[in-house]
Amino acid sequence: DLEKKGWQTILANNTVNETTPDFSKVTTASEKGLYKADDDYTATTGMKSYYFRGAVDNNWVKFGKDSTGKDIYWRIIRINGDGSIRMIYTGTTAPKESTKVVMTGEGTQIGKSAFNSNNNRSEYVGYMYTVGQQYGTSTSSTIKIAIDNWYKKTTLWTNLEIKALVADEIYCNDRSVINSAWSSTGSDFDYASLTRMSLNGKPSPSLKCTNTSDKFTVDSSNGNGALTYPVGLISVDEVAMAGGKLATSNSSYYLYTGQDYWISSPTTYSTTTKYAYEFLVYNVGIIGYNKDSNVNGLNGIRPVINLSSDVILSGDGTYSNVYTVS
């Protein structure tokens, strides 16, 4: 009997909800589970993406060590539609009974940074950007430089055995615009990710990234090939699917940390303030999109990586038996 793949282990340890959640409501403290949706791989692989939502306590992974030799702990965001496993940095402190659902504090991030230290053009919403272009990738953002500098000193990069377990997957930095025209500085407009989050209507988060130019990858076979290291940030769609919402606080879902931290999705450009804005998970667990989310604000960094579809997971993802990877 062939050993189960990691993604199969996760599916075996959870019951998949066949319904689609109501994204117009935040999750409650008693609401938790694994749900499914199409992503960028589904059309090719025939496999759904399976995402954790709400007050889950069995999505813990211990994987890799940071530059000081400390074990790194992650929370699984979702199984991607190719069987790889997407997860977000949660620090170097092992979870315990009291932190099994929600772990708070600055330790859940690698530090703080501006998204971009420049903020007076809409291009600066880019994880990478080119001045004068909506979808450019010639210059790394401030936050990308910080993430890359952290990543290359971890065993995720320095240890070849561990490096081989990390997959090159899509990080979506969706710079498309739906309801108006894009401009560098000439007009006010909302990005498509803000339109999808719909303040007054029903949010419609999507795990499909609209443009190849915004699918940040190392290799160009399934994305833009602009990255050096296979690491990025969580998208606002992923945060919404996990239980977050615009303008509604939520301190019971697994992405809540009591900190303000960056999301990879842009929101608006304002000619009044002359600022570009990016989404944040605010310290009350809200999906935030104004005032503090100006791209040169100083906010937390929680890197996201993906485990290969071939990894084996031991454990069951709970605080007392976190998944380990081989």
Where are these regions (language model features)?
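Long, domain-scale functional regions
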Residues: D1-S326
